[in-house]
Amino acid sequence: MVLEMLNPMHFNITTMVPAAMPAATMPILLLTCLLLLIWNYEGTSSIPGPGYCMGIGPLISYARFLWMGIGSACNYYNKMYGEFIRVWICGEETLIISKSSSMFHVMKHSHYVSRFGSKPGLQCIGMHENGIIFNNNPALWKVVRPFFMKALTGPGLVQMVAICVGSIGRHLDKLEEVTTRSGCVDVLTLMRRIMLDTSNTLFLGIPMDESAIVVKIQGYFDAWQALLLKPNIFFKISWLYKKYEKSVKDLKDAIDILVEKKRRRISTAEKLEDHMDFATNLIFAEKRGDLTRENVNQCVLEMLIAAPDTMSVSVFFMLFLIAKHPSVEEAIMEEIQTVVGERDIRIDDIQKLKVVENFIYESMRYQPVVDLVMRKALEDDVIDGYPVKKGTNIILNIGRMHRLEFFPKPNEFTLENFAKNVPYRYFQPFGFGPRGCAGKYIAMVMMKVILVTLLRRFQVKALQGRSVENIQKKNDLSLHPDETSDLLEMIFTPRNSDTCLGQ
């Protein structure tokens, strides 16, 4: 009998199953599928967004983030489904929020201080439970944050003004180093060098090959952006990620050498009072056992890359906006002449530069660089009536919020948008609360110093009708110009002179 059943020539399928399926079978199967869909959708069905569809929805939404980039995908889903929606990233529920009341709730509460991202990706770039920017271990993050806050406020803020003025002057005096063959100025490289030089002088104080480090920082940022959301399987195929691994190693090795030089300088210094900067405080904490050597090196790396990575692009966009809006330039120049005159800018001038401040705010609103914030819920919560489970990923789409609420002309670049006081819940370029940007005050001061010092010496012009609106951009972890495209340089014309750089 057994042999007959195993022999296909003798096996009769009709003896094993009924000739016809019972009439109730099909409805039962359909009901089972429906119950599975409901079970998979349970708890999140009240939140708008793409459907689960037996796992197809999460795959499609994750693929869209990998394909479009984080920023572009967020804008796509908010436009498609609304200002509070649910998607999936790497199989994890993720909320994308561009509603001011919901953002305010997330930013102000301490159970949203954690970040999220691919663990092997963050390990590769050195940010997994390390540093401050994407450290997703709240306990360790709280240990290092005070070092950043101390360096970025108080005396450090005051010292930065003179240091930055000096750096700008030196770099403008050798502008030919960032001038193309056609005579145009590579503004991004110029800004990155100025900001790296200023940061190094203020926070580390070790001579470096500025141009080489700037290139390494860009490689590191490209790796960070590329690896942040990659699936685990990506890191099991070495040829896929080895170029990013090399870019990270290049910068980390360079920073390790600089920090080691700092250690030797401290050990031979007669008076430590002259060297009590950010890096010195970290090294002392390492000697006390509060930090590891890896912690120290990563914190120094993140402090040095912050301004060249994002602020340089912000100033780049600002200069293009000034070139397009001569009335704004005129108002800025009148204020500079009134407040600063012919001398260098000082710390007591900063609060008086209201037109410059409003221009910076409107530039960051209209053309943001960091237009999203990534968080993770550390406990169950309810946001604007929607249940949020512990472990849920959250992306705050700040750039979109700045164009949806409060401002009288949200889709135009105009200083009228800041003619009246703007409640801070509607304008959050740096975030706020326990995980707000530690460098927001020093960033504002540095941008004012750079704009005032540069515009006093040069008038800036874009090439061939180029403007912020028609520059090709990439919107992923942050919004950057596509540096593979042409015509990103500018014309610098010395004021009160007939000579011109770029013509």
UniProtKB/Swiss-Prot annotation:
Top-level EC class: oxidoreductase
Membrane topology: Peripheral membrane protein
PROSITE patterns per record: CYTOCHROME_P450
Subcellular location, principal: membrane
Record GO biological process: female gonad development; lipid metabolic process; response to estradiol
Annotated binding of heme, by residue: 437
One GO cellular component term noted in the UniProt record for this chain: endoplasmic reticulum
Pfam family, one: p450
One of the record's GO molecular function terms: iron ion binding
Keywords assigned: Heme, Iron, Lipid metabolism, Membrane, Metal-binding, Monooxygenase, Oxidoreductase
Keyword Lipid metabolism attributed: yes
Family statement: Belongs to the cytochrome P450 family.
Protein name (Swiss-Prot/TrEMBL): Aromatase
Organism placement in taxonomy: Eukaryota, Metazoa, Chordata, Craniata, Vertebrata
